[in-house]
C-alpha cells in the first residue's frame, strides 16, 4: 500500500490518530468459532450461548488486550468518547458505540432476497449461517497482531470455560449510545494503564504456556517506557506537543 501510494506522491499512515478532535483509524477484528465446518455463533435467529460466552471472555479481558491492540500513545487519543471509537466495556447488536459489536449476519433467512434479484432462477433453499461474527472494535493499526490474536484466543477460552461468563456478558449488553450508560467499566487511557491491566491478568495469559512470563514482563516494560500516563492532560495544554506526537507515530503498522 505504501509503495503504491508513494508512486502517486501520496503518504499513507496506519496511525490510530493524526488529527486530534476528529475520528481516528481503527483495525477491527471479526471473529467466529467453527466446529466441524459449522459456525457456532449462530443458530437460527440471534447469537448462541457459545457466542455470548466468547463475548464475555473478550469483555472480561478487554482492558488488558489493549496492551497488544493499542500499544502506542496515539492509540489512546483515538479511544475517546464521541469520536466513533469505543471507550466503555460493553457489547451490543449493530451498535457502533460499543466495544464488541454484533454486525448484521444472515440469520434465519431463506432465499427470498436471491429470488427477488434473480426471478428466473430456481429456489436455492435456506442460506448458510456461517457469516455471523462478533467484532472487537478497540484495536488499531499499531497493534501487534500476533500477540493480539493469541490474547483473543486466551480470552475466548476463558469465556467458554468459566461458567460466569454468560451472565457477565448479559450484564454488559447495551442498546443505544454506550456513553449514556453509567456504571460501565472503561478502557485504559494510556499505554501505562494498559500495561498495569496486563500485569493484573498475566496469570490468564500465561496459563497453559500461551504467553511466556518473560514476554509479559518485556511487553509491559516497553509500554511503561513510553511514559504516557498523563499524556491526555499534557496535550490539552500544548498544541506543539500534539503535532510532535502525531509526527513521531505517523509511520507505524
Description of each model-found segment:
Residues 2-164:
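Active-site capping/gating regions of soluble enzymes
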Residues 170-253:
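Acidic, glycine-enriched catalytic cores built around paired aspartates
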Amino acid at each position: 500500500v505504501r509503495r503504491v501510494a508513494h508512486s502517486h506522491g501520496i503518504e499513507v499512515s496506519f496511525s490510530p490518530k493524526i488529527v486530534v478532535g476528529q475520528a481516528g483509524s481503527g483495525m477491527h477484528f471479526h471473529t467466529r468459532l467453527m466446529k466441524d465446518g459449522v459456525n457456532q455463533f449462530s443458530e437460527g435467529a440471534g447469537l448462541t450461548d457459545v457466542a455470548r460466552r466468547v463475548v464475555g471472555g473478550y469483555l472480561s479481558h478487554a482492558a488488558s488486550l489493549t496492551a497488544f491492540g493499542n500499544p502506542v500513545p496515539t492509540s489512546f487519543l483515538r479511544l475517546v468518547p464521541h469520536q466513533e471509537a469505543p471507550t466503555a466495556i460493553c457489547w451490543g447488536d449493530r451498535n457502533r458505540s460499543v466495544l464488541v459489536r454484533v454486525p448484521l449476519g444472515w440469520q434465519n433467512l431463506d432465499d427470498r432476497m436471491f429470488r427477488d434479484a434473480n426471478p428466473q432462477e430456481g429456489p436455492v433453499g435456506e442460506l448458510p449461517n456461517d457469516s455471523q461474527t462478533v467484532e472487537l472494535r478497540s484495536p488499531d493499526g499499531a497493534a501487534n497482531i500476533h500477540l493480539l490474536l493469541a490474547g483473543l484466543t486466551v480470552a475466548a477460552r476463558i469465556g467458554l470455560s468459566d461458567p460466569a461468563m454468560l451472565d457477565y456478558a448479559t450484564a454488559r449488553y447495551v442498546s443505544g449510545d454506550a456513553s449514556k450508560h453509567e456504571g460501565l467499566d472503561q478502557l485504559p487511557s494510556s499505554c501505562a494503564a494498559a500495561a498495569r491491566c496486563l500485569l493484573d491478568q498475566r496469570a490468564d495469559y500465561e496459563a497453559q504456556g500461551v504467553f511466556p512470563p518473560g514476554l509479559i514482563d518485556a511487553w509491559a516494560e516497553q509500554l511503561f517506557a513510553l511514559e504516557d500516563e498523563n499524556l491526555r492532560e499534557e496535550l490539552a495544554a500544548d498544541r506543539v506537543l500534539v503535532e510532535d506526537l502525531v509526527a513521531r507515530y505517523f509511520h507505524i503498522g
